[in-house]
Structure formats: structure tokens, C-alpha cells
């Protein structure tokens, strides 16, 4: 287990270095928004978050199906657990975020997201993983998406000037599209190589 975690940590560090190197390419036009260090961090976060989401999107239900032999009904409940927070909390989250600082919410959300994901491979390794566990994980991840995702959008408007918001949103959309195109294939290979629960650990490290 320690060897696998060391491998995942090393791999995530290499991906991070490659991404940082890519974002420092001298070929960028002089006025490109990526020259802004604060925006670069947001942009890198978008790529990493959405690539990791492709892993979890495949690995979480596969963990339920292959490790816990989940029934179709249980798989439906797992999907519902991730969706319910959007239905119940979207409006309250918006009202609450109007009254608090957004960046700490985003940072805490990312930390909770990583810690929640990390419980899945640990629970699988120790033999205590259950469908109830996965339901809770799915619900917490959904809550993080509601609060953290909304906060991230607001943080972007605070970092980037109004005149450059269209450019920022365009770049972010491109990053999301690229992650969604390349992510599933890479996620599938990672799951096949390491197994679904350990692949989730990789997303947690990202």
C-alpha cells in the first residue's frame, strides 16, 4: 500500500511540474491572461480538478460494482447521493456565499474533497468499505461541488478584471473541454492499472 501511495504521489508531482512548465511557455502572447500568476493558479486548478473528476466519475461506481457487488438499485442510490446536494443546497449556498469570503470556502472545499476521496481506498484496504460509506462520500462530494464550485466562479471574478472575464471564461472552458476529452481514456487506463479504489486515491492526491 505504501509503495502504491508513493507511486501516486510521485506521479501527481510530475503532472504538477509538467503543468506548471506548460503554463510558463514563453510562446504565449505578451498580453495573454496566463501571464497573470493568480489566474494561472486558477487555470491549473481547473485542469487538475476536472481531470481528477473524470477519474472519480468512473472509479466510484466501479468500486461499488466490482468491490461491493452493488445492485442496479444501489448504483442508482449512489448517483442520487451525488445529485441531491445540487437540488437541496444550490440556492442556500448562493445566499450564504454572498455573506462570507469566497476564497477560504474554495480552499476548504478542495481539502474536504481530497480527504473524503482518500477515505475510499483506505476503507477498501482495511475491509470496512460499504455502500453506506460510498453514499456518504457521494453526498459530501456533491456538497463540495455546490459550495466550492460556486465559490470558485466568484473568486474568478475577483481575480480577473471585468474587461478580461470573457477571455478567462473562454480559457477555463477550453481547459474543461480538454480534460473531458483526454480524461476518460487516461482515467480508464489508470483504473485498469491500479484498480478503482486506488485510482480514487490518485484523484485525492491531485
Label each PLM-derived region with a short phrase.
Residues 2-206:
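Alpha-helical transmembrane-bundle signature of multi-pass membrane transport and export proteins
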Amino acid at each position: 500500500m505504501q509503495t502504491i501511495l508513493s507511486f501516486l504521489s510521485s506521479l501527481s508531482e510530475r503532472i504538477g511540474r509538467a503543468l506548471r512548465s506548460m503554463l510558463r511557455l514563453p510562446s504565449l502572447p505578451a498580453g495573454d491572461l496566463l501571464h497573470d500568476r493568480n489566474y494561472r493558479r486558477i487555470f491549473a486548478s481547473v485542469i487538475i480538478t476536472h481531470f481528477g473528476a473524470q477519474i472519480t466519475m468512473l472509479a466510484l461506481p466501479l468500486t461499488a460494482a466490482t468491490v461491493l457487488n452493488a445492485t442496479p438499485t444501489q448504483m442508482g442510490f449512489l448517483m442520487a447521493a451525488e445529485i441531491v446536494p445540487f437540488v437541496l443546497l444550490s440556492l442556500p449556498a448562493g445566499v450564504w456565499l454572498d455573506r462570507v469570503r469566497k476564497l477560504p470556502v474554495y480552499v476548504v472545499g478542495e481539502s474536504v474533497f481530497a480527504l473524503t476521496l482518500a477515505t475510499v481506498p483506505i476503507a477498501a484496504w482495511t475491509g470496512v468499505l460499504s455502500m453506506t460509506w460510498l453514499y456518504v462520500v457521494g453526498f459530501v462530494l456533491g456538497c463540495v461541488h455546490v459550495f466550492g464550485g460556486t465559490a470558485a466562479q466568484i473568486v474568478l471574478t475577483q481575480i480577473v478584471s471585468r474587461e478580461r472575464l470573457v477571455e478567462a471564461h473562454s480559457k477555463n472552458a477550453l481547459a474543461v473541454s480538454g480534460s473531458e476529452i483526454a480524461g476518460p481514456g487516461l482515467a480508464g487506463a489508470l483504473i485498469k492499472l491500479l484498480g478503482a479504489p486506488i485510482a480514487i486515491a490518485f484523484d485525492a492526491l491531485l
